[in-house]
Amino acid sequence: MKKNDLGFYDSCAAHWWHPKAKIFALNHLNPLRFQYFDRHITNWQALKVLDVGCGGGFSCEFVAARGADVFGIDQSQSCITTAKAHAASNNFDIDYQYGFAESLPYLDKTFDVVVCVDVLEHVADLKQTVAEIHRVLKPGGMFFFDTINRTFKSQLIMIWLLEEILQEIPRGIHDPKKFIKPDELIDLMQCNGLNEVEVKGFNLFGNSVWDNVAAYLRYKKTGGFCVSINDNTSVMYIGKARKV
């Protein structure tokens, strides 16, 4: 079976914003992520923000609603088409482009903020992606991210449970070899001039098997998640860095 199979995003692009679509679960994560991001930026008004790996536009529209000047890029042309149409229908002026994280089509020192969520574990070249994010950030600009740790527990939950058993996410969409340990990402960012790094656990699942079951049942009943932003980075983690 193919790993890191990103064809799923093309296949679901047309239904991206449908509340019953499986991909729509990602939209529920934005308020949770921004609980953390807002600790570091309290006013998004007029900031120039790039979403790398924007998909059909969940995070872009969330930030645009806060008054930011938003740009989105994704390697799925189908997702970009959907994102443009949905933004237009909701009167959002968002600049969407087809492209790759490893070769961002923007000038140096363009953005106040770069957001990259649910993406770093999928890119073809993580080192080049981080270098490009640094390049397009203005001095003092913020990089916000989340991704999946490379641990036995993360593979158990993300692959065995969510892909294989519950089939809540498509089989093969992740390659556990591409999951990223926090220390690896921190070293990579610092080597590329991204400092003032902070990493926190983005804990959607709890610490025990019963916590995992309860979180899943809550999601099936309500369509939503509860999150703890803490020191438990064993499955997912969230963080920030600054270009200095």
Predicted regions and their residues:
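A C-terminal cap/extension of S-adenosyl-L-methionine-dependent methyltransferases
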Residues: 90, 187, 191, 196-244
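Conserved class I S-adenosyl-L-methionine
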Residues: 144-167
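N-terminal, positively charged/glycine-rich alpha-helical extensions of SAM-dependent methyltransferases
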Residues: 1-17
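A short glycine-rich, Lys/Arg-flanked "PGG" loop and its adjoining helix->strand segment in the class I
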Residues: 127-139
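A short acidic, Gly/Pro-enriched loop at the edge of an enzyme's catalytic core
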Residues: 102-113
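Conserved alpha-helix/loop element of class I SAM-dependent methyltransferases that forms part
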Residues: 27-47
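Class I SAM-dependent methyltransferase SAM/SAH-binding core
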Residues: 50, 57-103
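Acceptor-substrate binding/catalytic loop of class I
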Residues: 147, 167-184
